[in-house]
From Swiss-Prot:
Known catalytic reactions: [GlcNAc-(1->4)-Mur2Ac(oyl-L-Ala-gamma-D-Glu-L-Lys-D-Ala-D-Ala)](n)-di-trans,octa-cis-undecaprenyl diphosphate + beta-D-GlcNAc-(1->4)-Mur2Ac(oyl-L-Ala-gamma-D-Glu-L-Lys-D-Ala-D-Ala)-di-trans,octa-cis-undecaprenyl diphosphate = [GlcNAc-(1->4)-Mur2Ac(oyl-L-Ala-gamma-D-Glu-L-Lys-D-Ala-D-Ala)](n+1)-di-trans,octa-cis-undecaprenyl diphosphate + di-trans,octa-cis-undecaprenyl diphosphate + H(+)
Pfam families the UniProt entry points to: Transgly
GO molecular function annotation: pentosyltransferase activity; peptidoglycan glycosyltransferase activity
Enzyme class: transferase
E.C. no: 2.4.99.28
Subcellular location: Cell inner membrane
Keyword Cell inner membrane: yes
Keyword Methyltransferase among UniProt keywords: no
Designated gene of the protein: mtgA
Protein name as annotated: Biosynthetic peptidoglycan transglycosylase
PANTHER family given in the database record: BIOSYNTHETIC PEPTIDOGLYCAN TRANSGLYCOSYLASE, MONOFUNCTIONAL BIOSYNTHETIC PEPTIDOGLYCAN TRANSGLYCOSYLASE
Length: 230
């Protein structure tokens, strides 16, 4: 009995050590990426694997652009559409989560999310689209790391450069050129609002941008002038 307990204890210690090492590895990358741009993300690698399973020669559309070369209209539109308390929160919008929970309960299904830009970035950089309690806990921990190390300006810069905007399309520069044939720096208010409302489901809205989504884009355009941008 004692031998079995000692064995179980060793296994537990090994698991704890591996968990701690994994968190240290993530934190090291967070520190590194506070000064250097990530060349890829977990989401990018996942999508590339999916695309190459059908077409081995396919490549992602992605081009990094610095913060100052991203349209102010896109920054305002994305904050308005995805996280209107971005400047003020510490990574989590507790009131937004509560509103999303209440809306989902009324509808009887998941129709709204309460994830902030920081949480979405944590998921995009390190995790997968899968849903589990462990993944949500890991997302929260990475969000704390990012908010502790990066400025809001850096968070928004990385987010706009790595977020998915269509099938194989990542980052605002690739999205601007794909949908409007302009650089990200030249996006106007209407174009920025349209890109912003695609973010919840970009691969679907790339093909199905109907009247309801167009109306949502107009609402975002009317409100985004009030957004505070870092």
């Amino acid at each position: 009995m004692k031998t079995a307990l000692r064995g179980a204890g060793r296994v537990l210690l090994v698991l704890v050590a591996l968990f701690v090492l994994y968190q240290l590895w993530i934190f090291t990358l967070v520190l590194w990426w506070s000064h250097f741009n990530p060349s890829s993300t977990s989401f990018m690698e996942l999508r590339l694997d999916e695309l190459q399973a059908k077409r081995p020669d396919v490549e992602l559309r992605h081009e990094w652009v610095p913060y100052d070369r991203i349209s102010i209209h896109l920054k305002r539109a994305v904050i308005t559409a995805e996280d209107d308390t971005f400047i003020d929160h510490d990574g989590f919008d507790w009131e937004g989560m509560q509103r999303a929970l209440e809306k989902n309960q009324r509808k009887g299904r998941a129709v709204a999310g309460g994830s902030t830009i920081s949480q979405q970035l944590a998921k995009n950089l390190f995790l997968s689209p899968s849903k589990s309690y462990f993944r949500k806990a890991q997302e929260a921990l990475i969000t704390v790391m990012i908010e502790a190390v990066w400025s809001k300006r850096r968070i928004l810069e990385v987010y706009l450069n790595v977020v998915e905007w269509g099938n194989g399309i990542f980052g605002c520069e690739a999205a601007a050129r794909r949908y409007f044939r302009v650089a990200a720096s030249r996006l106007g208010p209407a174009e920025a609002a349209r890109l912003a409302v695609m973010l919840p489901n970009p691969r679907r809205y790339e093909k199905q941008f109907g009247p309801r989504l167009a109306a949502h884009a107009r609402r975002i355009r009317s409100r985004m002038v009030y957004a505070t941008v870092p």
